[in-house]
Amino acid sequence: MRSVPGPSPPCTRSLAHSCRAAARGPCGSARPRARSVSARAHSSEASDMARVQQNFNSAGVGLFFSLFGGNQSLALPHLAAPDIRHVDWRALKAAGFKGLVFDKDNTLSLPFALEVEPRLQPALAGCLEAFGGRAVLYSNSAGLQQYDPEGKEAAALEAALGIPVLRHADKKPGGGCAELEAHFGCPAPQLIMVGDRYLTDIAFGNRHGMLTVHVQPLTTSGEPFGVVMARRIEEFWVARWTSFGVHPPAHSLAPHDTLAAYVKDQPIA
């Protein structure tokens, strides 16, 4: 792991502002599919297994404490946006990136829901079109060997969202990137990691040299208590480290002075 200073802070309208605002609140083919499901269906299709396992992440806890000894840059995203509608995916593809790695809950869908959040569906469709469908879901429940050994959760997500779910052995931020590189057929630094959690999604992507994109959670309603508390702690420390001048790791395909161009104040789609 490394801490690489950069000439400018991570791109966002202001990462520190984004974090503080949040704290104030409580290579496969894919096409997105819109599903008409009610809140009742959302509740009935929620995974009890996922609810239990999200309360504790030993790899995330271990990384959090290690950051106090250095390498705080691992928790800082290259791009920070309200949601995926504010990111210029076509420009990122033109910069040389070859694939997208998405977290699911609170990034593309409400927690445990089996549908893409309706307001994000056009943006996701455009995003997948820009990358030729080269996207995958990387979940800390579905597809994870420990909790989904037979791939039933993964298969349900694939059928519902129309995006491949990566089968893998370790929870983010732990584990390697061999499965991702095998899936996409390219090295990890040519991939983009997108998620709403600093110490899981962003730290995992940065550990393996990906470009990292942090989005604000779609909601905190329905999240396990442990996740809510962990999120508040993450937001506090990321805002603090950013205010101290810590930057995300440098990336050869997206130098620090180019990052601002990839995030827009108004939704692109």
Swiss-Prot record:
It holds the Pfam family PGP_phosphatase. This is Phosphatidylglycerophosphate phosphatase 1, chloroplastic. It is an enzyme of class 3 (hydrolase). Keywords: Chloroplast, Hydrolase, Lipid biosynthesis, Lipid metabolism, Phospholipid biosynthesis, Phospholipid metabolism, Plastid, Transit peptide. One of its GO terms (biological process) is chloroplast organization. A motif (Phosphoryl acceptor) lies at residues 103-107. Belongs to the HAD-like hydrolase superfamily. Residues 1-33 form a transit peptide. Phosphatidylglycerophosphate phosphatase involved in the biosynthesis of phosphatidylglycerol (PG), a phosphoglycerolipid predominantly present in chloroplastic thylakoid membranes and which has important photosynthetic function. Required for thylakoid membranes development and chloroplast function. The keyword Thylakoid does not apply. It catalyses: a 1,2-diacyl-sn-glycero-3-phospho-(1'-sn-glycero-3'-phosphate) + H2O = a 1,2-diacyl-sn-glycero-3-phospho-(1'-sn-glycerol) + phosphate. Residues 29-46 have a biased composition (Low complexity). Pathway: Phospholipid metabolism; phosphatidylglycerol biosynthesis; phosphatidylglycerol from CDP-diacylglycerol: step 2/2. GO terms for molecular function: phosphatase activity; phosphatidylglycerophosphatase activity. The gene is PGPP1. NCBIfam families: YqeG_hyp_ppase. InterPro entries: HAD-like_sf (IPR036412), HAD_sf (IPR023214), PGP_Pase (IPR027706), PGPP1/Gep4 (IPR010021).
